[in-house]
């Protein structure tokens, strides 16, 4: 079964139907199992090759987390591209592929609130949507919790169909598309989180809304741009792999390819009221702390190499908090709040020195700020915060 990073169910299913036979290729289903033959991990994509007696299915997930394009990086859309071929020298029989995304993708847990189904159609795609009937944006923070506001989209390229699927009291989106021999079909998952974070009392929109975009508008772009985006992702992955192999060998390269999406996706991107970048991390099962300095420091080499402006976006919340009257100490905070609410530390309200890590966090802040200054060849950021 598919799940959230906390281990709680978030149901995605994939069904491949040939005649009356149904095969499951994604998530837990009642269909016949397909045999997994190959897995390939690249920086922005993971590709699976599966087989049934009648066909070979190639399934590729792509999240285009390219740091040289912040609008694309922030776009909350993941592609699922599927291709089928006949086996044993026989042509592919008539067949259909279906993806299902259920209400657990927009709730903390199944049945938490009633959900509302909708549809969106645009040039190049059709999408089904699910959203909680209770929309309390940024209503809570925590660790073992999942977003229960906003709206999830499951989209399929033009020629496909979307519909509401109901099983008992649970609702889901189902997207279907007929397959032809060797011809790729494209699906996409998207999420509108409405607001990204609360930043010292102010709700901030996600970066992808910077140009007044909507998810339907982004889906139109995403489907139209897929061939070039997929090409860019592959080129970047090949470059990263070659550079990593040159300095650390095959095993090191494999680790970097495996880690890329995990490291980058652990953040949300937005801007503060002054238009400065914020790149906010969330700790996993460690109080859910946001903008944690001892997360920023070890992850910074990736961003120093590929987009040092994002390192400044990681540091800004800590400097902002440390310079405010709310921070009583003469050393660096460990974090700026509990994701997605960056309103100051939640443990002891940031007032108990026993909860702090002054040597570690001051060292982390000094070294990371110095490294970003060198990477950008610019003293402006460091000079702005020199009094600290």
Where are these regions (language model features)?
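An extended acidic
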Residues: 1-53, 140-163
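Active-site-surrounding "flap" and adjacent substrate/cofactor-binding loops of secreted or lumenal enzymes
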Residues: 2-23, 109, 203-220, 321, ...
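Acidic/polar, glycine-enriched structural segments that form the non-catalytic walls/loops
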Residues: 65-72, 83-291, 312, 319-320, ...
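An acidic intrinsically disordered interaction segment
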Residues: 38-53, 252-271, 329-334, 383-387
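Aromatic-rich carbohydrate-recognition surfaces in CAZymes
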Residues: 181, 214-226, 288-388
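Low-complexity, acidic Ser/Thr/Pro/Gly-rich terminal tails and inter-domain linkers that flank the onset
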Residues: 51-72
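Short, solvent-exposed loop/turn segments enriched in Ser/Thr/Gly
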Residues: 74-79
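Short beta-strand/loop motifs in extracellular/secreted proteins, especially
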Residues: 12-14, 55-57, 93-95
């Amino acid at each position: 079964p598919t799940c959230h990073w906390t281990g709680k169910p978030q149901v995605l299913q994939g069904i491949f139907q040939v005649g009356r036979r149904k095969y499951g290729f994604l998530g837990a289903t009642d269909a016949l199992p397909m045999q997994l033959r190959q897995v390939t991990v690249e920086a922005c994509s993971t590709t699976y090759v599966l087989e049934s007696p009648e066909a070979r299915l190639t399934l590729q997930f792509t999240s285009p987390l390219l740091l040289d394009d912040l609008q694309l990086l922030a776009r909350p859309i993941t592609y699922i591209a599927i291709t089928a071929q006949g086996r044993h020298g026989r042509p592919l029989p008539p067949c259909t592929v279906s993806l299902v995304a259920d209400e657990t993708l927009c709730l903390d847990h199944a049945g938490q609130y009633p959900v509302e189904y909708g549809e969106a159609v645009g040039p190049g795609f059709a999408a089904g949507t699910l959203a909680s009937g209770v929309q309390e944006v940024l209503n809570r923070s925590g660790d073992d919790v999942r977003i229960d506001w906003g709206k999830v989209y499951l989209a399929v390229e033009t020629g496909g169909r979307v519909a509401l699927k109901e099983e008992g009291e649970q609702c889901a989106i189902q997207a279907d598309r007929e397959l032809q021999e060797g011809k790729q079909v494209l699906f996409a998952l998207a999420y509108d989180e409405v607001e990204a974070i609360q930043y010292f009392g102010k709700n901030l929109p996600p970066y992808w809304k910077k140009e007044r975009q909507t998810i339907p508008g982004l889906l139109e772009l995403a489907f139209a741009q897929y061939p070039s985006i997929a090409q860019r992702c592959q080129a970047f992955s090949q470059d990263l792999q070659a550079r990593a192999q040159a300095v650390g060998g095959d095993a090191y390269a494999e680790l970097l390819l495996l880690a890329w999406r995990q490291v980058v996706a652990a953040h949300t991107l937005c801007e503060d009221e002054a238009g400065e970048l914020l790149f906010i991390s969330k700790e996993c099962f460690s109080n859910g702390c946001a903008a944690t300095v001892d997360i920023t420091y070890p992850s910074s080499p990736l961003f120093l190499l590929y987009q040092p402006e994002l390192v400044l976006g990681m540091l800004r919340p800590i400097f902002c908090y440390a310079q405010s009257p709310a921070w009583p100490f003469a050393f660096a905070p460990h974090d700026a709040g509990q994701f997605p609410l960056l309103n100051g530390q939640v443990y002891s309200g940031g007032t108990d020195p026993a909860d702090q890590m002054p040597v570690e966090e001051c060292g982390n802040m000094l070294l990371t700020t110095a490294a970003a200054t060198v990477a950008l060849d610019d003293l402006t950021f460091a000079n702005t915060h020199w009094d600290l």
